[in-house]
Each structure stands twice: as C-alpha cells, then as structure tokens.
A protein has these predicted regions:
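N-terminal subdomain of nucleotide-sugar transferases
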Residues: 1-80, 220, 224, 228, ...
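Conserved nucleotide-sugar donor-binding subdomain of glycosyltransferases
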Residues: 76-134
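Conserved catalytic-core segment of nucleotide-activated headgroup transferases in glycan assembly
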Residues: 228-230, 234-286, 295-302
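A charged, aromatic-enriched C-terminal amphipathic alpha-helix characteristic of glycosyltransferases
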Residues: 370-373, 386-417
Length: 421
C-alpha cells in the first residue's frame, strides 16, 4: 500500500515531529512512502526517498507568478546534519513570525496559501506518478493544510487518515484576542470537512482518543509515541541534570524555576544543561548561569542518546500557565518515550492534569513535582535518594517496553490501513 504523508515537517532524526513520523513509518518500504511538506527543511533519514516541498516564501512569491514547489529524492537526504532546518536570515524571521500564531498571522498565512499556487501541473504529476492508495495527514493548527490533504484524497478518491499529536480543536488560545473566535471558527470548518471525510483518527494518548471519538463521532486509535531505540542505554552516570528539546510553551520558565532552586543547594549538581535548537532571543535571554542554566544549543541524535544516558536525570516539564496548559493538554512527545527507555531517571515538573505528566505519575515512571512549592522537596528526593531513583527507572523501562517499543506504532497503522483497504 502506497502512503502519501502530508505534514508541516519532513522525516527527520532530530526534530520532535520528524522523529515521531520516523517511528510511525520506519518499518514500511521506502517505495511505498512519499511526503508533501512545507517547512524549509531537508530529510535527515532515508526512511523515504520521494518528497515534494513547498515553502511559505515560495507560496507568497507564487502569487506574483513565480513557480513554487521542489521535488526531492535520495540525493537530497543529508544524514550528517544536526538539524533538518535550512532557513536563515529573512526566511528564518518569516518562520518565527508565523510561530507567534496570532489571529492575524493565522488568517494571513491561510490566505497566501489559498491565493498561491502549490497545486501546479508539476505537483499533480508528482502525485499521479506516485499514485498513493491513501493520504496520511499529520494535523496542525493551520486550515490550509487540512484543505490540501482533503483535496488530494478526494481527487484521487482514496482514504484519508488524520494523525493528531496535539489538540488544536478544543483549545482556542486566541479566544480573547481580536478576530480570535472568527479565525478559530474558520479553522474548525476546514477541520470538520477533513475529519468527516476521513476513515479514522490516530491519537497520541488514550484521553485524546476518548474525547475526540465523542466529539467527532469518528473511529480513534491510540498510538503511543515510540522510543527511537529499543533497549536501555548503558553509560556511567555523571552529576548532570539535562533538558533536551523544545523550549516553547513557557517551558523555559519552568527550567528557570528548577535551575534557580538547584543553585541554592550546596551540591555538585548546581545547574541544568539545556540542549535545544531554540533561536528566539526572548527565550534565550533566560538561558544563563544566573538562572542555573547552561545552554548548549542543538546536538546530533547520537549525542542526544549519549547525554541522556550519562545524565543523572532528564527533565520533562510543562507550564502551569492556564493558556499553556490548554495548548499541551494531550501532548506526549518522542522525548518522553526515549526518556522512559533510556534507563535515566525522569524529573517531571508540571501540572498533574496534563496527559504527559499524568501518564508518568500514574505509572510511577518519574519523580513528579506538581507545584513550585514542592520543588525543593522533589529535587532533594531526586538528588539524595538513589533507591527511589532506581525504582522510578525500573518502572519507566518496563512502561517503555510495554507501550513504546520501536515498530509498535507502525504495526498499528498497518493493521488499520489494511482494514480499510
């Protein structure tokens, strides 16, 4: 069965979304996969060798008559890159503006994708040559991507499957802003059209599957995010507490809480080592020694495993801010699966109602701290109680082997696609 993956991000071994996609399709034949994506990125894995990329810059220029769209193949895969992103300068600034996600940004970006010309003879020839049997759409918070996925599926008269890795439907984070309700209603119109046509939804956690099944009256299947490796990592531990990953959704402020508390202890561990590809100055200004943080920038996937293996603990955190809580309510990232499998103790700092924190807490797979007032006690437990750390590690590894082994997600997807073939 040939699958056309439609997503913002490319298959990658570094970015969170790219890694999750890899875990979904790593056991599929390369010849059965193609991907349409829109970020300024190049693939850094060879899971798929057939790509069509259209960027925002190309779409804006296409309104003025310039051509948009590039076909990429095996010769464009760069496995040695630390990051899949290729934009810089003005292109990077354009992307960062789009990340602010105000109602006007949403409306403007959706508009230029509707006025622009991605749907060219070149694009349609690429789709026809691949001749997919279904579309696998990785959902996001921009209406135009739902429209594109639905248009391809309808034109080819093939099933559409929608993968939901975050909640963009129940939570209108711009509800109190000018045009916020208008923009969200327009977005949900595209969402409902795509979901009504779809054959099934793949959800990131059980709570999302339950809620979406009830709301959309559509079959929902939970796919736990797979770890990027299949067994516990072996390494000598150092006195290092590490955070690896995205600093968005106010996670940087959570790290500041932890870092400042660590500095108060008269111990060998007196800071957090942060590894992230973050470039926003408004976030990086917090990544300083004064806040108990040493910022290292991005590192390649192999080094991520090394850092994770050698750390005394790795951090998972989500913000206590109400708006941020709504935005990440159902989020369970690849990083959590890797952390569970790693054999390193997880320190989870955040509200207990968030799916990821609750999942770790319910399975006693992390030392969980659910309020700032409990930080001191929780960190003392982490640093001073080796027996407790080992107990948490054992629970985490067992949970990873139960739900997050590589290949499990792909097996579930294959089974569902066969049912509807």
């Amino acid at each position: 069965m040939k699958i056309l993956v439609v997503s913002h991000n490319v298959f990658s071994k570094t970015g969170n979304m790219g890694k999750t996609l890899c875990s979904y399709f790593e056991n599929f034949n390369k010849e059965d996969l193609a991907q349409f994506y829109i970020h300024s990125e190049v693939p850094t894995v060879d899971i798929c060798e057939n790509y069509y990329r259209v960027t925002d810059k190309e779409m804006i220029k296409s309104i003025l008559g310039f051509k948009a769209g590039t076909v990429l193949g095996s010769n464009n895969i760069d496995i040695d890159r630390n990051t899949s992103r290729t934009d810089s300068g003005g292109d990077a600034k354009l992307y960062q503006k789009a990340r602010k996600r105000t109602p006007l940004i949403y409306l403007a970006r959706n508009l230029w994708w509707r006025l622009g010309h991605y749907n060219t003879k070149k694009f349609n020839a690429w789709v026809d040559e691949f001749n997919p049997d279904c579309v696998f759409f990785v959902s996001g918070d921009y209406a135009f991507m739902y429209d594109i996925a639905l248009k391809i599926a309808k034109k080819k008269n093939i099933p559409l499957y929608i993968s939901c890795m975050d909640d963009y439907y129940f939570n209108n984070k711009n509800a109190n802003r000018f045009l916020g309700d208008f923009q969200h209603k327009a977005f949900m119109k595209s969402v409902k059209k795509a979901i009504d046509y779809s054959s099934a939804l793949f959800c990131i956690c059980d709570s999302m599957s339950k809620d979406y099944n009830k709301y959309f009256n559509k079959k929902c299947i939970t796919i736990h995010t797979a770890a990027s490796f299949g067994s516990q990592l072996a390494a000598n531990k150092t006195n290092q507490i590490s955070y690896i990953g995205n600093l968005g959704y106010n996670r940087h402020l959570q790290l500041v809480d932890i870092g400042k508390e660590l500095k108060k202890f008269d111990l060998a561990v007196n800071h957090i080592d942060v590894y992230s590809s973050e470039i926003r100055e408004e976030i990086l200004k917090y990544m300083i020694d004064e806040n108990g943080i040493v910022f290292h920038g991005s590192i390649p996937a192999d080094e991520v495993k090394k850092v994770m293996a050698e750390s005394l603990a790795v951090i998972h955190t989500e913000s206590f801010d109400e708006n941020m809580k709504n935005s990440v309510k159902y989020s369970v990232s690849t990083k959590i699966a890797d952390s569970l499998m790693s054999g390193t103790c997880i320190l989870a700092y955040g509200p207990e109602e968030i799916a990821s924190i609750k999942y770790l807490s319910d399975n006693d797979a992390a030392i969980c701290i659910n309020s700032k007032d409990d930080l001191k006690t929780g960190l003392e437990e982490l640093l001073n109680d080796e027996k407790r750390r080992n107990e948490v590690i054992n629970n985490a590894v067992n949970l990873a082997k139960k739900n997050h082994l590589p290949g499990t997600a792909g097996d579930i997807i294959k089974e569902v696609l066969k049912e509807n073939a």
